Amino acid sequence: MINSCVIPVIKSPSDYQAYRISPDDSNRLAIVFDPAIANSSLTCCVEIFDVGGKTPPNRHLFALEMFFILKGEGRATCDGKTVNIKAGDSLLVPATGTHIIENTGSGRLYTLTIMVPNEDFAELIRSGTPVELDAEDMAVLGRQYQ
């Protein structure tokens, strides 16, 4: 017998807050869920890489990071091993793995990025510069592209 009812948190792309962590970064992150929204130690965001864009080399002490490629193509490097990635691929980066995600395609690269536990990732994102999602971003997130 169910004794409680939990109402899920539902968001749409127009609700997402997007940031560029550093002014010179060539990727943006649109927060879908984070500890402040989900009351759980996770960060879920859509990461948008401009043509030629990439993350700086980074690693996490405790967190796993998963990337699901929504659109585009690129290259992922973790601890010196490089693989090509494209729409539909999933990539799981273990804790302590030094990694880079890079857009090698002719258009933007979009990933659904999930980090568990949060390990201050959401706070890092929110400390950056707020940016707007443009029409191309909204079309991808709203599944309005072919």
Predicted regions located by residue number:
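Glycine- and acidic-residue-biased ligand/ion/polar-headgroup-sensing regions
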Residues: F62-E65, I69-G74, D79
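A generic "binding-loop/recognition-motif" signal
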Residues: D25, F62-A63, K81, G97-T98, ...
